[in-house]
């Protein structure tokens, strides 16, 4: 028996999740009545996810600001890098939202119990903007007011940097808290196969095999979003700003893009991207060693596109028709959430709560969406990481062009930014 347990634990988590997925489908089809006895596993998994949402949003964004605002990283080269990544991130969220609105992958999705979801009374735009600034920070954290939490996290991170030497110990504490949070998420993720087993079994028992149709449409939207992000955002930057020949650029980048797809990991892609940038693209070593590590931390076009797409998917699945103010809030919070995504596996799914909460969706409903999508996230992650790898090399080439025109970069080459797994 113990040998089987050890073999089970030795399997990669995504493989165990797939086993739980197939087992849940089988149980839901063959013994739908039995799903009532294992539904508590899905409920427990949802509660564990809800437990993580607020700490992830606050700690990851605050620590991200303190790390990014290192003066060594924010010279002229660093400032241009952040500006370009902010632009590509906003474009990526917009493209993801557009793909979701056009294809409508969430229509008819069987989320949780299938109970209708209703938004509360609409909040005027003025009040929504004013509510971004929390009157009581503790109350905002307890209530899961994500816009207020994001604002306070950014302000807290900036204040920590402005404190100088006195703020360094707390900045180190935030970095340590991020690593501890990573371990906590890893522990919760060990329960994922069982939570997925229960959630999928219940969904299949109630709705049949048609429950997977929406995932197919979602996967199609991810592919459309990645292609659109590269064609409509990266290619124009390469032509107009970096002055690069497109075919030659992507032939040089193919090694880094292949590693990004195969590993779904910025950590594995960064060394290859550095070699490609300096040897094949002839990008200045100082620029490459400054921009690419920053990009590994904040250059997540794939995540941004996915957060925008998944937000629209979730609203459609919950039967909510977004209006223009709601779409504007999704765009703003989606860009901020993607920019501050924590260095943890599938973090984009957890940051989804920050986006949906800003338009009135509860963390319980968001957790059900996460449980619905999570079994398939590995394959989707591989695809969207390609967009992030392309963005990192595109921005590096664009910054290199401007750096050559302005003279030597005034930022010290640094590899201090921690490469992270794409999420």
What positions do the PLM features span?
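Short, Lys/Arg-rich, polar N-terminal cytosolic tail immediately upstream
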Residues: 1-11
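Signature of multi-pass transmembrane helix bundles
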Residues: 8, 14, 18-21, 25-28, ...
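Juxtamembrane helix-boundary/capping and inter-helix hinge elements in multi-pass membrane proteins
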Residues: 32, 66-73, 79, 108, ...
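Membrane-water interface of transmembrane alpha-helices in multipass transporters/channels
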Residues: 34-38, 75, 173, 209-217, ...
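Transmembrane helix-bundle signature of multi-pass membrane transporters/permeases
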Residues: 44, 48, 61-62, 81-86, ...
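Membrane-interface alpha-helices at helix entry/exit sites of multi-pass transporters
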Residues: 73-80, 183-190, 280-295, 324-325, ...
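Alpha-helical membrane segments and immediately flanking helix-loop junctions
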Residues: 250-307, 335-349, 376-398
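Transmembrane alpha-helical segments and their short flanking loops
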Residues: 308-423
């Amino acid at each position: 028996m113990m040998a089987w347990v050890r073999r089970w634990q030795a399997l990669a988590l995504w493989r165990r999740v797939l086993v739980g997925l197939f087992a849940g489908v089988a149980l839901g089809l063959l013994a739908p009545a039995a799903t009532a006895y294992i539904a508590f596993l899905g409920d427990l998994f949802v509660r564990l996810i809800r437990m993580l949402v607020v700490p992830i949003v606050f700690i990851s964004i605050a620590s991200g600001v303190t790390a990014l605002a290192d003066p060594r990283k924010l010279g002229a080269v660093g400032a241009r890098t952040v500006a370009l990544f902010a632009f590509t991130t906003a474009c990526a969220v917009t493209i993801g939202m557009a793909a979701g609105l056009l294809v409508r992958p969430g229509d008819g999705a069987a989320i949780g119990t299938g109970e209708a979801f209703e938004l509360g009374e609409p909040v005027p735009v003025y009040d929504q903007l004013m509510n971004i600034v929390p009157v009581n920070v503790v109350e905002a954290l307890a209530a899961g007011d994500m816009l207020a939490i994001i604002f306070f996290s950014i302000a807290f991170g900036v204040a920590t940097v402005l404190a100088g030497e006195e703020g360094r110990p707390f900045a180190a504490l935030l970095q340590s808290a991020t690593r501890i949070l990573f371990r906590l998420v890893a522990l919760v993720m060990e329960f994922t196969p069982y939570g997925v087993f229960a959630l999928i079994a219940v969904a299949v028992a109630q709705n049949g095999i048609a429950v997977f149709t929406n995932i197919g449409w979602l996967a199609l939207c991810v592919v459309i979003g990645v292609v659109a992000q590269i064609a409509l955002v990266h290619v124009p930057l390469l032509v107009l700003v970096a002055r690069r020949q497109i075919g030659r650029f992507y032939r040089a980048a193919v090694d880094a893009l292949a590693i990004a797809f195969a590993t779904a990991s910025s950590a594995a892609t960064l060394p290859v991207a550095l070699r490609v940038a300096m040897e094949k693209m002839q990008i200045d070593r100082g620029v490459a060693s400054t921009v690419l590590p920053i990009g590994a931390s904040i250059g997540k076009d794939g995540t941004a596109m996915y957060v925008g797409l998944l937000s629209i998917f979730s609203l459609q699945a919950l039967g909510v028709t977004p209006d223009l103010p709601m779409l504007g809030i999704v765009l703003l919070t989606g860009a901020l959430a993607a920019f501050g995504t924590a260095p943890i596996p599938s973090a984009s799914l957890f940051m989804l709560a920050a986006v949906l909460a800003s338009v009135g969706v509860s963390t319980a409903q968001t957790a059900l969406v996460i449980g619905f999508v999570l079994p398939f996230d590995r394959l989707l992650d591989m695809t969207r990481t390609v967009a992030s790898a392309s963005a990192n090399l595109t921005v590096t080439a664009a910054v290199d062009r401007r750096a050559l025109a302005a003279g030597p970069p005034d930022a010290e080459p640094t590899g201090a930014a921690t490469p992270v797994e794409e999420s």
